Amino acid sequence: MGSSGLARLQGLFAVYKPPGLKWLHVRETVELQLLKGLNAQQPSAPEQHVRFLLGPVEGSEEKKLTLTATSVPSLTTHRLVRGPAFRNLKIGVGHRLDVQASGVLVLAVGHGRSLLTDMYDAHLTKDYTVRGLLGKATDNFCEDGQLIEKTTYDHVTRERLDRILAMIQGSHQKALVMYSNLDLKSQEAYERAVQGVIRPMNKSPMLIAGIRCLHFAPPEFLLEVQCMHETQQQLRRLVHEIGLELKTTAVCMQVRRTRDGFFGLDDALLRTQWDLHSIQDAIQTAAPRVARELRKNLSLMSGHQQQLPSAGQPWASRVQAPL
């Protein structure tokens, strides 16, 4: 088996990280399951060696012995002698998720680890759903943190929240243009903004390409955030800052990544699917799309292409679905 099974493990795939698990634990679990699957495969036929074995002479009534050339299997490659054929795999991790966060986590095996670098260089956006709770503030911006303050929120309306979100998106879009090294007054900056293809040229602070409210039922609200160069803790702090702008307080109840670049929830393998065959199939299915999208996005960063595929466009350039 060996080489053929390993050959189908070269590339990128996505898993769904549950909340409460460290990304390192996810990687180690996936590696363990892959090694178990690889080592359970039927081994290839052992090599045959010629040995001269002592035996009776055929057709002779006398008890004479002679040496006979015989082909016997070599035991040097037997798994009971050599041990497991695969002892470790090098698995790379894409944009990480902290312990409390859940959602799409991109992993790489073999040459796929170099594709992770290409993903970083393309500065692709990521989508999150962020659940907030009005009326309280904590030391870590999370619902389970140490309570600092309680406030009223009866004055908060959906319209007021939408205005705050529009202000946040507008300020971040200006920052996005600045970090893209485009002239704010140029036609190129305008056209790229309309097409949703503006990307920072280098590392930058968290940039929000789009933010909107999906659900508002005080004290709870649900946001969808499209961003890049973020951490999950920065998204929790964003909820806190939105609360302050609303003249109240707010904490974050949940951070869930629904898309990382061109990997969405539909691509993410659940924990019950972290096995050799499911991961091999996921890598093979994603490979053409990965190559195509990376080529488009890296060409865009080089200035050779003016349109980004729909997976990374801000919502302003998509058809809005009814909420």
Swiss-Prot record:
Region feature (Disordered): 302-323
Reactions listed under catalytic activity: a uridine in mRNA = a pseudouridine in mRNA; uridine(55) in tRNA = pseudouridine(55) in tRNA
One cellular component term from this protein's GO annotations in UniProt: mitochondrial matrix
InterPro entries from the UniProt entry: PsdUridine_synth_cat_dom_sf (IPR020103), PsdUridine_synth_N (IPR002501), Trub2 (IPR039048)
Major enzyme class: isomerase
Cystines in this chain: none
Location(s) in or outside the cell: Mitochondrion matrix
Any one Pfam family match given in the protein's UniProt record, by short name: TruB_N
Function: Minor enzyme contributing to the isomerization of uridine to pseudouridine (pseudouridylation) of specific mitochondrial mRNAs (mt-mRNAs) such as COXI and COXIII mt-mRNAs. As a component of a functional protein-RNA module, consisting of RCC1L, NGRN, RPUSD3, RPUSD4, TRUB2, FASTKD2 and 16S mitochondrial ribosomal RNA (16S mt-rRNA), controls 16S mt-rRNA abundance and is required for intra-mitochondrial translation. Also catalyzes pseudouridylation of some tRNAs, including synthesis of pseudouridine(55) from uracil-55, in the psi GC loop of a subset of tRNAs.
Protein name: Pseudouridylate synthase TRUB2, mitochondrial
Species the sequence originates in: Rattus norvegicus
Gene behind this protein: Trub2
